[in-house]
Design a protein with these regions (language model features):
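Short, solvent-exposed mixed-charge patches
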Residues: 250-251
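Short, ordered beta-strand-loop transition motifs
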Residues: 68-74, 147-154, 204-205
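Gly/Pro-enriched, hydrophobic low-complexity segments
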Residues: 92, 102-106, 112-116, 123-125, ...
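A short, amphipathic edge element
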Residues: 28, 57-60, 134-147, 192-195
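Extended interaction-bearing regions that mediate binding to partners or small molecules
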Residues: 35-36, 82, 140, 194-197
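Sec/Tat signal peptide C-region and signal peptidase I cleavage site
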Residues: 20-24
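N-terminal mature ectodomain segment of secretory-pathway/periplasmic proteins
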Residues: 26-109
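Bacterial N-terminal signal peptides that target proteins for export
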Residues: 1-11
């Protein structure tokens, strides 16, 4: 090989080595900006949940969600309020910045709370198409990111969890103009497991928020559609409303 060819090869290799960390850093900066724009002291929403299974059989529930804090350092309560057979069923989630969340589920018909074991986080949440793990709120610091492709109006980002997860990695589509996530594809060792699409965005107190979320369980050919008819940010909440005692009494 000539000295010129060798020099070109070395420059090409050096360029590739230098470009790789910048590419990865760009992806992290994008996700940090996504998180920054979504941050709020608290969140409240009410809406409907439709589970559409095989044969297009539809089961509809209504629920309320409250969250105090954000992105890892947060507490949340999710509670069904209709129909009567599921009214009062609730889930308390204590999120952490450096580990998986703690979760307890309350079922009025049995009159006691159930701690959701870590090994059970991959199971479906109360007949829906998302798992208990999907309900966690994790900080971007718990993931590694790489920019997979630039698709014009959106970035496609490959996300890999640093902590134990049912998912090996996921793809996220982030709109460039609003830094909102519009689609997520979740993969396990067996392949694509779930997709999540966010639609009908509206800006509320400066935060772009999807009013419709659709989760598809690819392995079950089932989907769950969430529609939010009431959404509020930075509303007054108390730590006392995010305890097991509060979960029991329906606070």
């Amino acid at each position: 090989m000539s000295s010129v060819s060798t020099c070109k090869a070395m420059l090409a290799l050096l360029g590739a080595v230098m470009a790789a960390p910048v590419f990865a850093q760009d992806a992290r900066q994008i996700m940090e900006e996504v998180q920054r724009r979504q941050r709020a002291d608290s969140q409240h929403y009410e809406g409907t949940l439709e589970v559409i299974g095989n044969g297009n059989r539809i089961a509809t529930k209504r629920w309320v969600y409250d969250r105090l804090g954000s992105f890892g350092a947060s507490k949340a309560v999710l509670r069904f309020i209709a129909p009567p057979e599921v009214k009062g069923v609730g889930l308390l989630i204590l999120n952490h910045t450096d580990k998986a969340s703690d979760q307890w589920m309350w079922r009025p018909n049995i009159g006691r709370e159930q701690r959701i074991a870590f090994q059970d986080r991959s199971t479906r949440f109360f007949g829906t198409d998302f798992s208990f793990e999907d309900l966690e709120e994790r900080d971007v610091g718990q993931y590694d990111f790489q920019l997979s492709s630039d698709e014009g109006a959106a970035w496609k980002i490959d996300s890999t969890p640093r902590k134990t997860s049912q998912y090996t990695h996921s793809f996220l589509w982030v709109k460039k103009d609003t830094y909102t996530i519009t689609r997520v594809e979740l993969y396990t060792k067996k392949g694509l497991m779930r997709t999540i699409d966010y639609r009908d965005f509206e800006q509320l107190t400066g935060i772009w928020t999807a009013r419709t979320t659709e989760i598809v369980d690819v392995t079950r050919n089932s989907r769950t559609i969430l529609k939010y008819d009431k959404l509020e940010y930075n509303v007054p909440m108390k730590d006392a409303d995010f305890t097991i005692d509060a979960l029991r009494r329906g606070a």
